[in-house]
């Protein structure tokens, strides 16, 4: 019997399913790694073939990044004298517009090379393949270091980010894609670099000449595409009688004409459903920008927040009515009114559906409003989400605020949404629904929310998410970086009553602290005290700056130059 028991004990050790599973997983990971290396090697060979002159200058070692519009490789410059120099090679996709490529290069050459803005060393081209050579900055992953940064390191990080933003904003450059992966950080050397100007736009007074040209080309292209669909009021006298057909149709529709704001006049919906502009300074300089709102037009969109959106024409009758009404309305609006900003939103003479949860056939027949929407989900400002046509450098400051929010809360990504309406609802859970609605009115947008959501106290929110109360630090798995994978807004947000999902301390599995584990606890206490020094005494100035960065009104949002002078950075050298 003892021998029998011995066999039963040995069998699980010799043929352990758990061990077999670990071996299988290890083998699978090894195969995936080999497959990845083979793919990288193939990509490097293709790059050498596409741009042969690279082989004379660089030895490409690895592929270190890949995005929608480019791939980045690590290379060593083969210099005849001096030490080897590491170079980052950015290979732009062949379908990139030549003007866009030239504009990105001009941003790097004019504004880059100082104040934490990446510069450029060389540029190579062969046919439609362009490679930009930039200094290589070895950097850490934001996610890996997020929960080990000391409070002083966070101050230094934000200070250097604002230096970079001040630099590019002085040249009239709107980066449009400010996020941790585009702000490289070498923790050991304390070096920083703002990179990737592929989506950059120019302000109205930009000093980057090619950004002006990009805007002009983009606007002319949209105007030419919609020229055949535009009906002006020049041939219809203002005091003339209303056409009989229009008069008869208007009696069948119980709708009152709504005066057009600047945004409503300029943006229409074409017959083919494409976005277009009637013409007048609608900025959209990004070629090939991705549409991050592909889910927003689906019928199961969130009922919590409803924008006054424009959709395709639903029937021929409403299209005729809208077309003839536009012919008269366009004549009424003179050039002075056309130049008004989107903040002038008339309160009178609106149609029946205005500021309600319904959209009338007249509004459905209008062309969709065109506005710049390029950027990364989770970092886009409210004015971008609501398609405000007049966007400024303030959108970069909002993105910086989201980064600061992640640093203070220990959560990344903080916002995670599949479409614009969900993203707006998540912003409301932090900043408040009433505040969001009021701010939207300042740039001519009407937002409806089914339930009022109060604004959160930023200090309480960040301390709760980091696992600390206002007085004593509490140890949670956030310290080991486990909670950084959880967005502050859950993916399962209830859109009928959007709310913040919080995880109480001690409910994480895996690496959570346990009372009986004295060795690991002692080690983590030491690491906690070393790396998280200062987190139990976060000053009010930090949350005041965060509040100003996340100002829902872009007109009053703090600028990079003002942020550098904020008391949060006192006693720090600029």
From Swiss-Prot:
GO terms for cellular component: cytoplasm; intercellular bridge; mitotic spindle; nucleoplasm; nucleus. ATP binds at residues 64-72, 90. GO terms for molecular function: ATP binding; kinase activity; metal ion binding; protein kinase activity; protein serine kinase activity; protein serine/threonine kinase activity. The active site is at 177 (proton acceptor). Forms a complex with either DBF4/DBF4A or DBF4B, leading to the activation of the kinase activity. Interacts with CLASPIN (via the acidic patch); the interaction is required for phosphorylation of MCM proteins and CLASPIN. PROSITE patterns: PROTEIN_KINASE_ATP, PROTEIN_KINASE_DOM, PROTEIN_KINASE_ST. Kinase involved in initiation of DNA replication. Phosphorylates critical substrates that regulate the G1/S phase transition and initiation of DNA replication, such as MCM proteins and CLASPIN. It comes from Homo sapiens. This is Cell division cycle 7-related protein kinase. There is a cross-link at residue 268 (Glycyl lysine isopeptide (Lys-Gly) (interchain with G-Cter in SUMO2)).
